[in-house]
Amino acid sequence: MAERPARKAPMTHVGRVVRTERLTPHMQRVVLGGDGLSVFSADEWTDHYVKILFTPPGVSYPEPFDVQQVRADFPRDQWPVPRTYSVRAWDPKVRELSLDFVIHGDAGIAGPWAARVQPGEEVRILGPGGAYAPSPEADWHLLAGDESALPAIAASLEALPPGATVHAFIEVTGPEEEQQIATDAEVVWLHRGDRPVGEALLDAVRALEFPAGRCQAFVHGEAGFVKELRRVLRVEHQMPREDLSISGYWRLGHNEDGWQASKPEWNAQVEAEQETAA
């Protein structure tokens, strides 16, 4: 696979809500547009993501907005609260950005916002970031994740050429959470039910008879099962690190702030445990 380029410094953009749509009982789409996205672009990677910057109640920031200046001038409890979301789609012709949100009632910040936001409202976003897209050099592709990875997996499937060899596994709570994806690849929807998150994914990947040739894998979602799937791919199947895009998007028992703070240490521990055995 080609070597990844250095990451560019993220830019701040302002998106205006164009429309919203409830895709499934627990997945809400918010489409952003407007002049504030005039220099935004997200057409390089299929795992592009943005950080939505939520302003704490009662706080306002000087214009032009500069997140680094805000962090220097404002007390920490008045900083924008970032929440990271994958880009489901970017349409450069009409300059519309689609973001999908998992809804868990009133829990969290981003989900409740997505459920209630109305067209015309504006929100600041930082980005995009990203580092993965299906490579034509791969003989076959493995895509596996939970609801949090569904937007990036769907974007990746839609970017693959017809006839590509793909094994795609997406774990959701039940059949009502399945979505239509514009791909000729077979998507295996795994229904979690009352099982722990990721358990069905682990079983499915372990049971998979790996095709011959070079695999490129995209595995994302809850950190616990991602760690175990990394062991399956890296240690048991001896996949090269450069062919793996694998990371915990979230972790049970942690909000995003706590997870992002502890993620470097978590990743270092996973590396120390698994790279010795690989």
Locate each region found by the language model.
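Extended, composition-driven regions rather than compact fold-specific motifs
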Residues: 1-278
